[in-house]
Curated annotation (Swiss-Prot):
This is Syndecan-2. Cell surface proteoglycan which regulates dendritic arbor morphogenesis. Keywords: Differentiation, Glycoprotein, Heparan sulfate, Membrane, Neurogenesis, Phosphoprotein, Proteoglycan, Signal, Transmembrane, Transmembrane helix. It is found in: Membrane. Residues 79-93 have a biased composition (Polar residues). It comes from Bos taurus (Bovine). The gene is SDC2. Residues 23-148 are extracellular. GO terms for cellular component: cell surface; membrane. The lineage of its organism: Eukaryota, Metazoa, Chordata, Craniata, Vertebrata. Residues 1-22 form the signal peptide.
């Protein structure tokens, strides 16, 4: 039993360390992108013209445009609904959010030239179709998949606890019966001989 707990502890430590190692390696901020050195931190184009034309007094022209801020009135009654909202969007709106491709325009044109006319006309990306997206509530336990995972984890934990209790009771009973090997040697039958029960009086 002691070995099982030690083994379980080692497995748990290995899982936690693997999880933290995966988080560290997946972090995009650790490595610089070699393709975009100009966008990297601390690398700026050299422009000496701005330094020579400034007076240093701070009274120069203000080349910045004023920032515009917009505000919306906040509704007085907060919206509280437990039902998720359904928002309709079209594929063209979703495709506007897709990041730009890394192919050059010449490669894209070459691919379009090689496509037959029947495939070009029936491109599903160009058609507007309705897509329903469900907005999830802010509360974590109101989401069905999280609630199902918590319930399943609770049931498995409860069954595991019952299993451990039953195993403990079984071992205690077996130990009380005497058939449980405790590592002690039983004395041989020749070691203890029964004394004669007859008494002789002189």
């Amino acid at each position: 039993m002691r070995r099982a707990w030690i083994l379980l502890t080692w497995v748990l430590v290995a899982c936690v360390s693997a999880e933290s190692r995966a988080e560290l390696t997946s972090d995009k901020d650790m490595y610089l992108d070699n393709n975009s050195i100009e966008e990297a931190s601390g690398v700026y184009p050299i422009d000496d013209d701005d330094y020579a034309s400034a007076s240093g007094s701070g009274a120069g022209e203000d080349g910045e445009s004023p920032e515009l801020t917009t505000s919306r009135p906040i509704p007085k009654i907060p919206f509280t609904s437990t039902a998720p909202r359904v928002e309709t969007t079209t594929l063209s709106k979703i495709q506007d959010k897709i990041p730009a491709q890394t192919k050059s325009p010449e490669e894209i044109d070459k691919e379009k030239v090689h496509l037959p006319d029947s495939e070009r006309k029936t491109d599903p990306a160009e058609e507007d179709t309705n897509v329903y997206t469900e907005k999830h509530s802010d509360n974590l336990f109101k989401r069905t998949e999280v609630l199902a995972a918590v319930i399943a984890g609770g049931v498995i934990g409860f069954l595991f606890a019952i299993f451990l209790i039953l195993l403990l009771v079984y071992r205690m009973r077996k130990k009380d019966e005497g058939s449980y090997d405790l590592g002690e040697r039983k004395p041989s039958s020749a070691a203890y001989q029964k004394a004669p029960t007859k008494e002789f009086y002189a």
